[in-house]
Design a protein with these regions (language model features):
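Active-site glycine-rich loop that binds ribose-phosphate moieties when present
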Residues: 181-193
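Transition-metal
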Residues: 1-181
């Protein structure tokens, strides 16, 4: 992506109004591709194989497509717009995040705007060759204890996009070599510490 046709934050208002009027309140968003350095692309996102590592091999392969996102991907070495959805109108682009900041409740509704003062959610296609590492996302209450927001998440694998299972559907939960059964029992006993 080049910056030539990207509208700066302070110039979004005028083009946003025109885009919303032309789309009867709907905005056209461009694809948002996100690589993961620790996973391998499953090749079902309909990207050309030459584009799977568009950000470079060190960044990892593109295995996620995000929709309606105002959230930057939490990837090391990311490009400035990674994870952000762009609105496309008359050959120009601006971030959905800037659009939401500009239009507020007019764009996302009063209830969401008043509660979050931003667009707090997004959807994604998730496409890996094999299982993702075992991990967890904290709920809102637990995340707040460490100054973060919760991340409620669920997965749906539509058959239309999953006609090939690749190396799925399982995950691994591993322990360091040498971990004994008693080590695990001791850790579980200290769960609430």
């Amino acid at each position: 992506m080049t910056t030539e046709n990207i509208v700066s934050t302070d110039n979004v208002a005028a083009i946003l109004d025109r885009a919303m009027e032309a789309g009867d309140g709907l905005l056209r968003l461009t694809p948002t591709w996100v690589p993961r350095s620790f996973l391998h692309p499953g090749r079902r996102l309909k990207l050309h194989t030459d584009d799977l590592y568009a950000y470079g091999a060190e960044r990892g392969g593109i295995d996620e497509r995000w929709f309606g996102s105002t959230t930057e991907a939490a990837n090391e070495g990311r490009v400035w717009h990674e994870g952000l959805s762009f609105v496309s109108f008359e050959g120009e682009l601006f971030t959905l995040r800037d659009a939401v900041a500009e239009a507020g409740a007019r764009l996302i509704g009063t209830a969401i705007w008043e509660k979050y003062n931003r667009w707090p959610i997004y959807s994604k296609f998730f496409d890996n060759m094999g299982p993702i590492p075992h991990h967890m996302h904290q709920g809102f209450e637990d995340a707040a204890l460490v100054g973060q927001e919760g991340k409620p998440e669920s997965y749906y694998f539509p058959p239309q996009y999953n006609n090939v299972d690749n190396n799925f559907c399982y995950t691994f939960m591993g322990l360091e070599p040498g971990t004994s059964k008693q080590d695990v029992i001791d850790c579980l006993a200290r769960w609430d510490d």
